[in-house]
């Protein structure tokens, strides 16, 4: 978009806040504010969406309806939709690494559905044409390699009464990782703190697709939250990893040696304090996690 010289007021950034506004449970503390400051650095408005109560409330649901979806509105207020109809049911288990989104419910309930709800339930998007850009790449998984580069989005209603024309475009589906880092370097972007500590992709801190070294690293960064996860595994009788409990899995891994106290502090703070675009006197460097361990969505 920057290369095409498109006016910044015609595009907006959206971010699905996995943990919502109540507490940090599964995601990096710094991620929402990093996204906020990233958007500001490029002069782009950003709107956040989340499920009320976030990951934790959805996981702890017991004979209850799923919570409403929440989304920021242009006037600064919060819109809410859903959570009032359907059949009460129970989760009390972590999402599992699977292609089926009913099993991998963190993707469907906390990302995909929340994004769609923010579009479908705002009348300002009626009688408009919307293009959603998303950054999936084919190198990330065999499943993502099959994604269409261009297709109608699930929020599309171009033939309905609201005439809401919504397409999804995946402009970097066929990019290599080298191409991604090249454009990041060109615009002198300081990436999310997790990359500098050794992560090869920025997802949740405790992403269910994480490998043994990532979970060992996450444990070194947030030991209290790992203990809570371990206790919940025992309570549920269901583990994040299919073959063993989380503490056993962590013991098989090695924390990344690029984790420093300084980066730990930045990554676990709710406020991001560094410039997103590097100042002229600071040299851009490839982060430790670049071209590292590949473990992501199936």
Regions found by a protein language model. Name each.
Residues 1, 5-6, 34-53, 121-124, ...:
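Peripheral terminal appendages
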Residues 1-186:
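ATP-dependent adenylation/nucleotidyltransferase module used to activate substrates
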Residues 126, 198-201, 223:
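A short, structural micro-pattern
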Residues 188-201:
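Immediate flanking context of iron-sulfur cluster ligation sites
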Residues 99, 197-200, 288:
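Residue-level signal for mature regions of secreted extracellular proteins and peptides
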Residues 200-212:
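Local cysteine-cluster metal-coordination motifs and their immediate loop/turn environment
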Residues 107, 158, 205-208, 270, ...:
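Secreted/luminal cysteine- and crosslink-motif detector
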